Amino acid sequence: MTLSEEISQLHTNKVPSIPRLGVQEYYYWSEGQHGIYAMFGNLQNGGQPSNADIGVYGDTHSTCFPVNLAMAMSWDPELIYREAKAISDEARGFVDKSLFGKSQNNLGELKTNYGYLTYWAPTINLNRDPRWGRSDETFGEDAYLTSLMAAAYVNGYQGQTMDGKSETGYLKIAATAKHFALNNIENNRQGISSNINDEALRDYYTSQFKYIIEQAHVAGLMTSYNAVNGTPAVANTYLVNQLAQRTYGFDGYITSDCGAIRTTYDNFPLGHAWAAPGWTSDRKGYSAVWTNNETGKTISAAAGGQAYAIRAGTCLNCGGGESTVKNIEDAIKIGILSKGVIDRALTTVFTVRMKTGEFDPPEDVVYTKIKKDVIQSKKHQLLAEEAAENTLVLLKNDAVDGTIKKLLPIDASKIHKIVIVGDLAKKVTLGGYSGEPDFTVNAVQGISEKLKAVNPNIAVDFEDTHSATTSTIPAVLSEKTKENIKSADLVIVFVGTDEQVSHEDYDRASIAMPGNLNSMIYQVAALGNHNMVLAIQAIGTVQINFIKDFFPAIVYSSYNGQSQGAALANVLLGKKNPSGHLNFTWYLDDTQLPDMSNYYLTPKQTGGLGRTYMHFLGKSSFPFGYGLSYSQFKISQLKILTKDVTPDDSVKVSFDVTNTGTLPGETVSQLYVAPPEIKGKQMPVKKLQGFQKTKNLQPGETQHVNLSVSVADLAFWNQKELKSVVYDGVYRFQIGYNANEIADSSEVNIQGKLTPKVTHVTLCPEDLVYQVGETINLQSKNKWIKSSINPGLEEQHSVADNVVEAVNNDGSFVDLANAQIKYRSADILVATVSDLGVVKTVGKGITTITATVNGVSGGTVFIVK
């Protein structure tokens, strides 16, 4: 490719074809968090978006599953894996060329075109504050739970086994994990800085990214709008290159968030008015100019921001106008970018596209056999309902008025009248980036249909009570509804949140029950019928500490997909015994929450009670991991055979879970580890280190559970030593029903040092394309990955700017001057490499040069012309 052609391939929207090279027109930006939401390339293929027809543009819509926050409350990685497989099936189904006589997802003029397969999902930022407007996209507040759930999602999405191995040799579709990193505020998100120390950055905010890079081999990453400690994430060399690529071993493509290159140079609130080290910005917003502090040379800040983003590793510009030939040529001319950096970016992008089978004969790619019939198939419809049933959390279930029998489940044969109140009960709130299904079931529909299927004579009355999440006037109950409530066998009060309260670009100001919903609750409660269920469907925590005593039973879900009403009905009726467990702490009220801009977690650093179950010292409405069942379970027989271990060992934990109730059911047993107190550090109270969802246990049945904890996973980043350390001391292993309710515990003494072992080796030379006769020294530095962090803005980091870097399991970089490195060329007719890492190009062609450090290898392509 020419430089102009290369540049044209490094943005995401309507990337032009190059017919002479067999490259089709392409569109990277597709959305599919919990159902195919949008394939923006359809705009170029006859589709016309409208407010009435969002989602997949055209007449064919897709199955919508529960949002990630809901799915993770199943605590069932296998269920999420099946959901993701179904979503990616539908993504491939939209590439069926028979759809509307041509592929709905087919771009360009080449006969070989069969669409694009890169999707901006999943969101794996941690839900550290319930007010965040995108909480529904997350897998919860815990990094460990998120890691396992997100890995299952990526594996299912990309056509891999549950342990991350490719099933066919091809990517089914390419997942793009977002947003890297510390993207947890919507208000002014393009202009704010998320400030944090390395301990929290590594141990909490990016640990789930590390896991899915290493274990699920996610194909793509998306950087975030925010800055991190003053340096825009999109151009942050430490964050993107050193952490994601060279420490965690990420080798896929990295895209900016859409329009995020602009945040490098524009003024607040649209950007950070940033300039790279050695440069000064005139801070004139969209027209800003950088001036070199030594030479006085100038360059447009748009060109500078684009150059430093690519240098950091953000190879794709999503939706921005900065990736132009002029900007790139200006950056190269002034010396802040090189053709070699462009080549490397292009290589990572096309490598992922090749893995989807785009450049292979379609008959060789098994996924091309997936047809349009999978879209909204009966199988997927049933899976959406199954998923929704498994995410519902039973928060409370008491007996009424001194009776013995608990209110739930409902015995439909003994019910004559049910009243449902609340406008949300007749709405289907799907959440951010939802599929647009043709089939949906709201709560009123689901409850009516399921009840009348058992007892056709049941009367189901509904009134919205003029309730709304945005209303500022009291709810109104009609006299008829009041009388119906007084005489009803059961009253269901449906409350929660919707997109009017919280969404992308808009955080909640408060976790208080929104609008006039509390007004409705108080009026219903005053009528004296105690047979009441509070059904909450919300983006996360809503304040209920003043109202929960009104209700013997409370059921919660987040936005629960297209079959949310059917799933709720099945749980209320007992057709499905609830087994969901909270993946966040249900705080009492706003006074327990620090300022959203404070990214720290500990009580001392947040100036309050701390964030998440790991550090929170207050009393919550419900703890992390909480969830009831219509049955009861007992954990017993905890056994840990080895009580003295080193950081190189694993701790084997076993116990029994017995259904002591009268109904079949499932539960989630949870393993927490409480670390010792360490002088000078605020350690977490405990951390989740294992869990097991049981099978459906019959009354009296016992399941034996075995869990294993790698002691190395108990390490914490030590800023002084610039590595992760497992501290000596006594650790308490706790097995329980939730973070607060521990059934049993046992102490394990951990002593010694973690033995450093190389985990990743990376090669990043300044160029990839060479002429015959050149000599390249691999034992040198790459000037293009020099830090983009302005001195004084951050604490000291280790530096990883060598061409060859090797990282250990403790996050430290190997001192290569004292290491044994073995080099190899895959084709010595193209290039040779000496024992000292000197490469000599000897013939035209392509070869891979690898470096092996302590038995672990990494490599890069060398192209010789």
Regions found by a protein language model. Give the residues of each.
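Glycoside hydrolase catalytic-domain context in secreted enzymes
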Residues: M1-F716, V725-E741
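Short, surface-exposed beta-strand/beta-hairpin micro-motifs centered on an aromatic residue
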Residues: H704, L722-S724, V838-K840
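Short beta-strand elements
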Residues: E741-L754, F862-K865
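Extracytoplasmic soluble-region selector
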Residues: T755-K865
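Charged, amphipathic alpha-helical segments
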Residues: A715-E721, I785-S787
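Short beta-strand segments
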Residues: Q703-V705, D744-S746, V814, G858-V861
